[in-house]
């Protein structure tokens, strides 16, 4: 399949991305809608989830991506492989996450990853970063107790900001105080492979969903 060429950066605050997603019938997509669900926010071309769905067939996988051509391409790859535990959805996660999970059985979301999100380096653009307080709040509402959130970045400031947002909520605790030295997921993302290939650091953190929220310590 010819690789789709797309714009590297998409402004999630643009009006065209403020519309809530049209929800498909997930029971028609997944062979077993009751399997535990792994969510990848900002899945890009979706190759990470494409591999995960094959490595862990007892799970369902959902990738969210704001660049529609990549979603179309990723679902085509899924169909070519005949995977019935994987789907990609075009949406703005900060707008549509709650609506998406109202369409799934309650308590189905067990794991979430946000891997190498767009850093939006300029200060005036940092409100475009994907990990905003609203996103963390939505994940706190739908992730099961004991559920895991994996955060990866090759930019330390971005990784710290993501960690601060989750620590500030009170429904999550960080499982290790320092960065994880190794990737504890069974598959490496495309970006992580490239970063490690250049002998550059990857900043990884794991957060766990608490049963009862703790008082906020860090301001978002």
UniProtKB/Swiss-Prot annotation:
Pathway: tRNA modification; N(7)-methylguanine-tRNA biosynthesis. GO terms for cellular component: tRNA methyltransferase complex. The active site is at residue 118. Its EC number is 2.1.1.33. It comes from the Bacteria. Substrate binds at residues 122, 154. PROSITE patterns: SAM_MT_TRMB. S-adenosyl-L-methionine binds at residues 40, 65, 92, 118. One of its GO terms (molecular function) is tRNA (guanine(46)-N7)-methyltransferase activity. It catalyses: guanosine(46) in tRNA + S-adenosyl-L-methionine = N(7)-methylguanosine(46) in tRNA + S-adenosyl-L-homocysteine. Pfam families: Methyltransf_4. Keywords: Methyltransferase, S-adenosyl-L-methionine, Transferase, tRNA processing. Belongs to the class I-like SAM-binding methyltransferase superfamily. TrmB family. Catalyzes the formation of N(7)-methylguanine at position 46 (m7G46) in tRNA. This is tRNA (guanine-N(7)-)-methyltransferase. It comes from Trichodesmium erythraeum (strain IMS101).
